[in-house]
Swiss-Prot record:
The enzyme's E.C. designation: 6.3.5.2
Organism: Geobacter metallireducens (strain ATCC 53774 / DSM 7210 / GS-15)
Protein name: GMP synthase [glutamine-hydrolyzing]
GO CC terms of this entry: cytosol
Annotated keywords: ATP-binding, Glutamine amidotransferase, GMP biosynthesis, Ligase, Nucleotide-binding, Purine biosynthesis
Reactions it catalyzes: XMP + L-glutamine + ATP + H2O = GMP + L-glutamate + AMP + diphosphate + 2 H(+)
Record carries keyword Ligase: yes
């Protein structure tokens, strides 16, 4: 497969909306390639990118404020369809002579969009009996529609909520079609990229694999490649994909740091070394990691220690493979976006990432990142296509530092062993009760505090384990999962009875925000 799957592409310009990555994911779900770039992308770069269409995202600013984010005026003269969402619609309206003012009544949440006049092809199937439920999030609105544009949607509080200029192929919506709270929003984005922009939908798992295999072979040639295999989804799929491309030229290094889930090391070896025939070097480094972490309780310092030691051990092993020229990583597109944002100052680096930018300059290997264009759901889809086990591909996210950041405070072997067993019981019960696939992320946390208990006729003074389970579509916000009481009771009873050293189990009912999903 050639690079044809990239020939039809959509450009998304980001004005700072919390939902911008969701726009990209919806475009990809329509089987069309897209990239996300800052709103101030140079016009020459946009021309070179040659998009079939452009989407302007929402954003937190007001278009009439001094210094408000804007695009080069010639953007609208490129002759490709443009869809403005929320701030993007207001920006486009103002550019063509319309007016944007503060709304008398701000709209946040659900609203009914009512069809006005004759909505164009973008809205085919979007309105049912003249209306469509949508999700609003705006404090400004368009008060005067620019010449050439027609209003095709309104709500009770905003008379201009959807506009179109069919002659110039320009469209704007005040609502957010990218979020799940707009039920037919996915259809609207699909219609824009497929019907309005004319993309045929070549971005499919099979085509992505064929394209990646061709590119890996062209990039690597006959060179040797090494990859740090963690057992997580991203590195596992990267390993399977690279092995599909170059076979025995790939050697994986699996560093068992003593902070993995129960029996995870054996499972990784069984999947890759035994079933797929991948060359895997397993390094038992538990003692080195626990020694390095001794006495350290600061979460960020623990992350740095674990990350640095992993690189040190990986380098030791890679030096033994003297003819290796490439280092492969399971970097995915959100990692790339987040790291770029941190460099440009347009995003905050909340937690250090275990993967992107973590390699020292003295490692002279060239970088191979076959997943760097893909979102997590796309990675999972190609993982299944490559034949990886369903449970491995669809397992919940696991942090790079492993249990090191699920043990609060200092990491000790005793704590890790307790947490491993408690977590395994928790996950086993979630599977058995049919909850696991409904939950976005679930895990146990070890709390280094003891509480008084009673077992039999004796008093106990043992540790506390917290259970966390959340539901989320994007991991930017998350709600706690309402696990039924009878399931909580069964899980708690099993952990207390089967895991020595625990006499109390608690359930975390914090949402994100204000809490993060992980405890550290």
């Amino acid at each position: 497969m050639s690079s044809d799957i990239h020939s039809e592409k959509i450009l998304i310009l980001d004005f700072g909306s919390q939902y911008t990555q969701l726009i990209a994911r919806r475009v990809r779900e329509a089987h069309v390639y897209c990239e996300l770039h800052p709103f101030d992308m140079d016009l020459a770069a946009i021309r070179a990118f040659a998009p079939r269409g452009i989407i302007l995202s929402g954003g937190p600013k007001s278009v009439y404020e001094e210094g408000a984010p804007a695009v080069e005026e010639a953007l609208f003269e490129l002759g490709v369809p443009v869809l403005g969402i929320c701030y993007g619609m207001q920006l486009m309206s103002r550019h063509f002579g319309g007016q944007v003012v503060p709304a008398g009544k701000r709209e946040f949440g659900h609203a009914d969009l009512l069809a006005v006049g004759t909505p164009g092809p973008l809205f085919d199937g979007f309105f049912v009996e003249g209306k469509s439920p949508v999700w609003m999030s705006h404090g400004d609105h368009v008060s005067l529609v620019p010449a050439g544009f027609q209003v095709v949607g309104e709500t009770a509080n905003a008379p201009v909520c959807a506009i179109q200029d069919l002659a110039r192929n320009l469209y704007g919506v005040q609502f957010h079609p990218e979020v799940n709270h707009t039920p037919r929003g996915e259809l609207l984005i699909d219609t824009f990229v497929r019907k309005i922009c004319g993309c045929s939908g070549q971005w499919t798992p099979g085509h992505i694999i064929d394209d990646a295999v061709s590119r890996i072979r062209a990039q690597v040639g006959n060179d040797r490649v090494i990859l740090g295999l963690s057992g997580g989804v991203d590195s596992s799929v990267a390993a399977a994909l690279i092995h599909r491309a170059i076979g025995d030229q790939l050697t994986c290094v699996f560093v068992d740091n003593g902070l993995l889930r129960l029996s995870e090391g054996d499972q990784v070896m069984a999947t890759f070394a035994e079933n797929l025939g991948v060359k895997v070097i397993r390094v038992d480094a538990e003692d080195r990691f626990l020694t390095a972490l001794a006495g350290e309780s600061d979460p960020e310092k623990k992350r740095k220690i674990i990350g640095k030691l992993f690189v040190d051990i990986f380098e030791e092993e890679s030096n033994k493979i003297t003819d290796a020229r490439w280092l492969a990583q399971g970097t995915i597109y959100p990692d790339v976006i987040e790291s770029a944002g941190a460099k440009t100052g347009k995003a905050h680096n909340i937690k250090s990432h275990h993967n992107v930018g973590g390699l020292p300059d003295y490692m002279k290997l060239k970088l191979l990142e076959p997943l760097r264009e893909l979102f997590k759901d796309e990675v999972r889809a190609i993982g299944e296509e490559l034949g990886l086990p369903h449970q491995m591909v669809w397992r919940h996210p696991f942090p790079g530092p492993g249990l090191g950041v699920r043990i609060l405070g200092e990491v000790k072997k005793e704590y890790a062993d307790i947490l491993r067993r408690a977590d395994a019981i928790y996950i086993e019960e979630l599977y058995a009760a049919g909850h696991y696939d409904k939950i976005s992320q679930a895990f146990a946390v070890f709390l280094p505090v003891k509480s008084v208990g009673v077992m039999g006729d004796g008093r106990t003074y043992e540790y506390v384990v917290a259970l966390r389970a959340v539901e989320t579509k994007d991991f930017m916000t998350a709600g706690w999962y309402p696990l039924p009481y009878e399931d909580m009771a069964r899980i708690s009873s099993r952990i207390i009875n089967e895991v020595k050293g625990v006499n109390r189990v608690v359930y975390d009912i914090s949402s994100k925000p204000p809490a993060t999903i992980e405890w550290e």
